[in-house]
Swiss-Prot record:
Gene disruption: observed consequences: Viable, but some animals exhibit sterile and lethal phenotypes including hermaphrodite sterility, embryonic lethality and larval arrest. Defective ovulation and terminal differentiation of oocytes, which result from a delay or an inability to complete meiosis during oogenesis. Defects in gonadal migration. Defective sheath cell differentiation in terms of cell shape and position and defective functions which include weaker sheath cell contractions. Abnormal hypodermal cell differentiation. Defective MAPK activation in oocytes in the presence and absence of sperm.
Free-text tissue specificity from the UniProt record: Expressed in the gonadal sheath cells that signal the oocyte, but not in the oocyte.
Taxonomic path: Eukaryota, Metazoa, Ecdysozoa, Nematoda, Chromadorea
The protein, known as: Homeobox protein ceh-18
Compartments where found: Nucleus
Keywords recorded for this protein, A-Z: Developmental protein, DNA-binding, Homeobox, Nucleus
């Protein structure tokens, strides 16, 4: 057995004496001493003629030993069963020192390297005498007077022990080579990335479930005296983690979004302005002299309009609705926003500027007269039907002269004639859709008079009916279905010769009866016993 194993065996025998407590015996001065030399026999004066047998001498020595009463003294520093913990910690310290000086650990490797000679025996550590190790262990046990052994005390002793001892590894496997055995960590271990601060590392070491120091927090196991604890990280890894400052890593810390520098924003604005000036110059060259507006004046009005709109409390959507009620054309919120940001074409901005300027002037005068924003939004200013009736606050509620008001009214009426009115989307009910489907089945291309009769019978506009027939024919072309009467559309249907002489109501009734007959015909075909049997559709009188 080597020196290190003899040392551990000695400690085990000492601690086994009284259930894990350190026990010493007070013996005679002849048996006590600093060294472990054997007791000397009692000196006696023996003559040459007197012969004392050897058995007698042995008996006298045994009697002396019995006469000395033994007294057990328990170490006050060992009040708990910590034998396994100390032995496992010492074994772990020695093994970690050997592995640290023998093998260069790979960077980022979380597995522990254990060296073995293949015979289950620990490797001998040269340069560490048995007496030196015993003396250091005794000093460690006697230096802790508070009655407890914790991990902090063991770490301090281990640091002092490591500074003074520089072991030199010696192989005992007979080949002169050390065989590294890589063993993966227990699944109870967590990743070393979680121990980025000394506080977290110490907390993890003191946690029994992680298994850094064993089941009882000191690296020992209750299964046996010299049972090996769980595999723990190497001292180099723990020391590097302890010395690592607490700093958030770059990968885990999200970078703060950098604001756009003012130089870039100014460059974008300048390029946007140059693009607007170029397009405006090209469009202004093609415009007449009356409609041409200076670009600087247009930009100044856009800024003024935005400030006044915000001052009065109007949103961009409110301005679009108010312009739609005033001039009969709906303006979306996007249009007003693009006008304020100079994102519209120069020609469209020139057309929209007079409308916004007049609306802004009317709103300013109405608010000065005591009107509220809600009243101005809810006020109806559009025309009813084909009768153009324009209501102006500045004409009826202010003291402007009659000449100015007449000029304003006439200019608005003339401008309304040039504004394109957008037709509202027509929603057809179920009866109107069914009637149009029936008419389309009879004649997909009705002439002008037929289309007018259909529109009057369904109480729809003729343009709505015309667009519906056009869309339906386009839909039928997309699905590649044949359309009856595509080439020639006579004024009188050959199937129903008397159809043209009917009124609109009679035509709808006849079309509905035809549809019901077709449905009954389909039902009779589906329930007939023979597919070749003639079916009675009930429409033979036609």
């Amino acid at each position: 057995m080597n020196t290190l194993e003899n040392t551990f065996q000695f400690l085990a025998e000492v601690f086994e004496a009284n259930g894990g407590c350190l026990v010493t015996e007070r013996v005679s001065p002849s048996l006590s001493g600093a060294s472990k030399r054997k007791s000397r026999p009692v000196k006696r004066i023996i003559t040459e003629d007197e012969v004392i047998p050897e058995e007698e001498v042995v008996e006298e020595e045994e009697e002396e030993k019995v006469e000395q009463p033994s007294e057990e003294v328990t170490c006050p520093a060992m009040q708990v069963d910590a034998t396994d913990a100390i032995l496992a910690s010492l074994r772990q310290i020695a093994n970690n020192d050997l592995s640290e000086h023998c093998i260069r650990e790979d960077e980022g490797n979380t597995s522990a390297e254990v060296f073995s000679n293949g015979n289950g025996e620990d490797m001998e550590q040269a340069g560490l005498a048995g007496t030196d190790l015993l003396r250091r262990v005794a000093d460690m046990l006697q230096g802790n007077h508070n009655g407890s052994l914790n991990s902090h005390f063991l770490q301090q002793q281990f640091a002092a022990f490591k500074e003074t001892v520089d072991p030199t590894p010696v192989s005992t496997n007979g080949n002169g080579l050390l065989t590294p055995i890589t063993t993966q960590l227990s699944p109870l271990f967590t990743s070393t990335d979680a121990f980025n601060s000394p506080e977290k590392l110490l907390q993890a070491i003191m946690t029994p479930s992680l298994g850094f120091l064993g089941a009882n927090g000191l690296g020992a196991s209750n299964s046996g005296l010299l049972s090996s604890p769980l595999i723990a990280p190497s001292p180099t890894l723990l020391q590097s983690l302890m010395n690592t400052p607490t700093q958030p890593t770059a990968s885990l810390t999200p970078k703060k979004a950098e604001n756009r520098p003012p130089v870039v924003s100014q460059t974008l604005k300048a390029s946007k302005r140059r693009l607007f000036d170029d397009t405006s110059r090209i469009e202004a060259a093609s415009m007449s002299g009356d409609d041409r507006i200076d670009m600087n004046e247009l930009e100044a009005f856009a800024q003024t309009f935005k400030k006044q709109r915000i001052k009065f409390g109007f949103t961009q959507g409110d301005v679009g609705v108010a312009l739609g009620k005033r001039y009969g054309t709906d303006f979306s919120q996007t249009t007003i926003s693009r006008f304020e940001a100079l994102n519209l074409s120069f020609k469209n901005m020139c057309k929209l500027r007079p409308l916004l300027k007049e609306w802004l002037a009317d709103v300013e005068m109405a608010i000065e007269g005591g009107a509220t924003v809600t009243d101005l939004i809810d006020k109806k200013t559009i025309h009813n039907g084909n009768h153009h009736t324009i209501h102006h606050v500045d004409i009826h509620e202010t003291s402007i002269s009659n000449s100015i008001s007449s000029v304003t009214a006439s200019s608005l009426l003339s401008r309304e004639q040039h504004v394109k009115r957008r037709r509202k989307r027509t929603n057809l009910d179920m009866n109107q859709r069914n009637a149009l489907d029936t008419f389309f089945a009879l004649n997909p291309r009705p002439d002008h008079d037929k289309m007018t009769d259909i529109a009057n019978s369904l109480e729809l506009d003729r343009d709505v009916v015309r667009v519906w027939f056009c869309n339906r024919r386009q839909k039928m072309r997309r699905v590649d279905e044949p359309i009856e009467g595509e080439m020639v559309t006579p004024s009188v249907s050959p199937v129903f010769p008397h159809f043209s002489s009917m009124s609109a109501l009679e035509q709808i009734q006849e079309a509905a009866r035809l549809a019901s007959c077709q449905a009954s015909n389909d039902d009779s075909d589906g329930t007939s016993g023979s597919p070749d049997a003639p079916s009675n559709d009930g429409c033979s009188d036609l």
